[in-house]
Structure formats: C-alpha cells, structure tokens
Amino acid sequence: SIKALLERRIDGIIFIGDNSDIPLIQSIAAQSIPIVTGDRKVGNIPSVTFNNKETVQEMVDSLYKSGCRKFMYVGETPTGQSNLLNRYNGYTDALKKYSDTTSVIFLEESLHGDKLKTARRLFTKKIITSLPDVIITSNDLIAQGIISAAHENGINIPNDMQITGFDDSLSSAYFIPSVTTVSQNIDELAKRCFSMLMNLINKKSAVSSIIEQNIISRSSAKINI
C-alpha cells in the first residue's frame, strides 16, 4: 500500500488514480514529499494532463458540421476528477455556440464501477426513450455497452444513431461497429511524469504540462478532422 511505501521514506511518488484518492494526495504533498499526478490535476500539485476539453469541443464541432443536431452526453459523474470534468465541460461549452441544437446529459455514479453493464442498462430499462443523432461518452466501455444494447433493440449504429467513446481501449478497434474514440499517448504521459518527478527530487523546478490527444474516426461516428 501507499502508506507502507511512505514508511520506507521513498524519494517521491507518481500518482495516477481516481477522485477517492485526493485526500491521500493532499496529505502526501503536505509532508513535502515530491509528488506528481498524471491525467488529472489536484490543486497546485505538479501534473501532466491531456487536453480533454479541447478534444471534446473539436469532436462536437465536427459532428455538428456533419449534420448532428440532437446531442446526448453519457458519462461518469465528474465530481473531483479534472479529466472527466474537462470532457464534460468541453461538451457543454461547444454546444453553447449552436442555438439550433438540443442536448441531454446523463451522469451516473455507478458508471465509475461496471461501465459496460450500466451503459447497457440505459437501453434495457428504457432510460433513453428518444434517440439523439449522436451520443458522446466519457469512456470506451460506456460506448461499447450502449452499442451492444442498441443492436439488441434493432438500432443501427451509425445509421440510426452515432456514438463516440474516449481513451481508445484495445477492443474498440475490433468492436462491431468499431468505436470512434480519442487516443491518449500514455507513453508520453509516463515519460513526462518521471522527468517532472526527478526535477522535484533534485530540487529543480517542475512545470505542469498538457499533452494533445488524437481523435480516431472509425465506424460508430464519422468525424472529419
């Protein structure tokens, strides 16, 4: 455990976790132990993050230009997680520009757990009663769950409704239909986090940085980038 590591007087920590760990991160930083967070920001702690907000805005803009007018966002509740919050804000901010669109937002706490099962429940329990032109999700597993349930209910993806994921999981390229998603350079994230931590350990400055992401257009939604 992290507490056991701290007892061994480690030189520093690179932390990639969820919002439940924020108090622990803040506690470690308060002890003046060098710490870097990856894929999320926690206060003023040095971090390496992705441009989540801008990427979702770009996705929404492209889908609007292709003719989509009824949008839906399905994702985990973003409370306390900067990466999820930025994806959500990218969606809402992008749609503010377009007065002729409608938007439905479905945030579900249980999506933090079994994303695939919870996403399928949106259709099996008829939570989604009116099909949007496109559903933008915060995670590939959520997108896959909705696609699976839609298929069982006779809904064709992407002809009846388009859907996008986020994080380019290994199965998304082979899912039927393949999932339009966002690719994150995890290797670059790791390299920058390590370099930043070494700077902190050596009493040098550590400047937070943001990594750009790539939208991967596949069969579930056509995005022209």
Which ranges hold each PLM region?
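Alpha-helical recognition/docking segments in bacterial nutrient-uptake
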Residues: 1-61, 127-128
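Short acidic/polar active-site loop segments enriched in Thr and Asp
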Residues: 11, 68-71, 133
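Flexible loop/turn connectors
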Residues: 123-225
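Short acidic capping loops at alpha-helix termini that bridge into adjacent secondary structure
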Residues: 70, 101-104, 157-162
